[in-house]
Amino acid sequence: MKAVLTRVSSASVTVGDEVVGSIDCPETGGLLALVGVGAADEPDAWETMVRKIAELRILDNEKSVSDVGAPVLLVSQFTLMGKTARGRRPSWSDAAAGGIAEPVMRRIATGLRERGIHVEEGRFGAMMKVASVNEGPFTVLVEC
């Protein structure tokens, strides 16, 4: 499992003409979390990802999402699992199938909400337009 976590002051996901998720957090900052679920992920990898998203101290003043009550926009992104070492076309063989990845994404969202974190989500499997106002810019790659 991989995630790209970007510190943002706002972010949104649009499917067609509908905004399906958005966060606006100019005071605290928030995170845009693009998450790719791998075919070979350990069964508890989602728990580690929840902990990382909630507790990494990557907001202003070395605070975490949990520390300041910052929101998270969670978006599934299987392309993070792409392999590009050979040839000119990425291989998606390391990405989990939709039937496996979708419940994992739901577990991550639920796990964050159980910690009291406000979570907005993209729409699994949809073609989405993701907009964000990056702060810093500050972006980290997390692998579980």
From Swiss-Prot:
Places the protein is found: Cytoplasm
Motif Gly-cisPro motif, important for rejection of L-amino acids mapped to chain: 136-137
Domain of life: Bacteria
Main location: cytoplasm
Catalytic activities: glycyl-tRNA(Ala) + H2O = tRNA(Ala) + glycine + H(+); a D-aminoacyl-tRNA + H2O = a tRNA + a D-alpha-amino acid + H(+)
Gene Ontology CC, one term: cytoplasm
Physiological role: An aminoacyl-tRNA editing enzyme that deacylates mischarged D-aminoacyl-tRNAs. Also deacylates mischarged glycyl-tRNA(Ala), protecting cells against glycine mischarging by AlaRS. Acts via tRNA-based rather than protein-based catalysis; rejects L-amino acids rather than detecting D-amino acids in the active site. By recycling D-aminoacyl-tRNA to D-amino acids and free tRNA molecules, this enzyme counteracts the toxicity associated with the formation of D-aminoacyl-tRNA entities in vivo and helps enforce protein L-homochirality.
UniProt remark on domains: A Gly-cisPro motif from one monomer fits into the active site of the other monomer to allow specific chiral rejection of L-amino acids.
Family under the similarity heading: Belongs to the DTD family.
Name of the molecule in the record: D-aminoacyl-tRNA deacylase
Protein encoded by which gene: dtd
